[in-house]
C-alpha cells in the first residue's frame, strides 16, 4: 500500500514523514477515526514504508533488490515482519474449548485487504461468515 493510494490525510502523512525524518518513530501508533476515514489505509501505507516500500523515492532499505523483495511481499500482505490482530469469530460448530486466533482467519484478512483497504467492521464480519451464526 503506497501513500499515494491513501485518500486525503495530508496532515497525518506529513506528521508520519516527520517522525521518519527525525528518526523518532514510537514503538506503537494508534490510527483511529470513523468508518471510511482511511485509518486502515494510512496505517498500512506507513507500515509498508517502514518495511521497505518506497515513499517519494525514498526507502528504509538500502538496495534495490531488498526494496523489490519487500515490495513483492507487501503486495500480498505477507511480509514476515508485518503482523495483524483483528476481530474473529468462533467457527460454526466449534466446541466451547476451541481457541480462535487471528491466524485462523489470515487468508480471509488478506483477501479483504487485497480487495479494498476502505472497509467496515460489518464487511469484515460478513467475510468471516458471522451473519450466518
Regions found by a protein language model. Give the residues of each.
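Clamp-loader machinery-focused feature within the broader ASCE/P-loop NTPase space
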Residues: 2-133
